[in-house]
Amino acid sequence: MTPPILSMLDLVAVREGGTVAEALQIAVRTAQCAEDLGFARYWLAEHHNMPGIASSATAVLVGHIAGATQTIRVGSGGIMLPNHAPLVVAEAFGTLAEL
């Protein structure tokens, strides 16, 4: 039997009393652990105006986490298009896809 393909969705939660910088470091380590465990994908979700979530700059996080991992595919689980110019989103993720 073929094992299931596993993926993870991360909102990059900021722990109570923690900082955004700590949450971002934990996200990198989480992606690296997921990679070590054989996960195929690591998804990041975009959220704004929520002090407990640090994933507002999704394209930046995708690039940062992809640069800290080797084999896991890193991507966006959602972009809030009303908050962005569609061409900018297409160019940012098109560039990330080529890196």
Sequence positions of predicted segments:
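The substrate-binding groove and active-site-proximal loops of carbohydrate-active enzymes
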Residues: 75-83
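Glycine-rich, flexible loop/turn motifs
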Residues: 68, 77, 95
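Glycine-rich anion/phosphate-binding loops
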Residues: 21-26, 82-95
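Active-site-adjacent segment of SDR/Rossmann-fold oxidoreductases
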Residues: 98-99
